[in-house]
Regions:
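Pepsin/retropepsin-fold aspartyl endopeptidases
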Residues: 1-141
Length: 141
């Protein structure tokens, strides 16, 4: 089964998960932020360099909070929590920030499955499955 359920950090309330990215016979493991406001998944320059990618001439437009920018992209395999794999993902670069994630898991991956973030009895839980096994309908629960 390609799914996982993990607890969120109670201090940040941010949906962080462990992410492994593979390319060029190398692997990088770090924290990724599940970001529904991010159209495409992305990695930091640090991860790009660790994976042995050269600077890319291939770019495309990315729409950010700061406006439209041209960003390079690369192809990687991504493994999420519980060994959930997504292969040959076109991933963008983003500028890292202090204590920030190494990855953004964007709608390009999220939209391939079902995502639920729930808060019950004070515990915040992230659940994800890929591919989707059906609709989550809170009105029918």
């Amino acid at each position: 089964m390609n799914n996982f359920t993990v607890s969120c950090n109670p201090d940040t309330h941010a949906p962080y998960i462990q992410v492994k990215v593979s390319a060029n016979d190398r692997e990088y493991v770090g924290w990724g932020l599940i970001d529904t406001g991010c159209a495409k998944s992305a990695m930091t320059v640090e991860v790009k360099e660790y994976l042995g990618f050269a600077d890319s001439e291939d770019t495309h437009e990315a729409y950010t909070a700061g406006g439209t920018v041209n960003v390079p992209y690369y192809f990687v395999d991504i493994t999420l929590e519980n060994n959930v794999k997504v292969e040959n993902v076109m991933i963008d670069l983003f500028t890292s920030y202090k204590n920030g994630p190494k990855f953004f898991i964007g709608m390009d991956i999220i939209s391939k499955g079902n995502l639920a973030i729930t808060n019950y009895n004070g515990g915040m839980i992230i659940s994800f499955e890929i591919p989707s096994r059906g609709t989550i309908d809170f009105q029918k629960m």
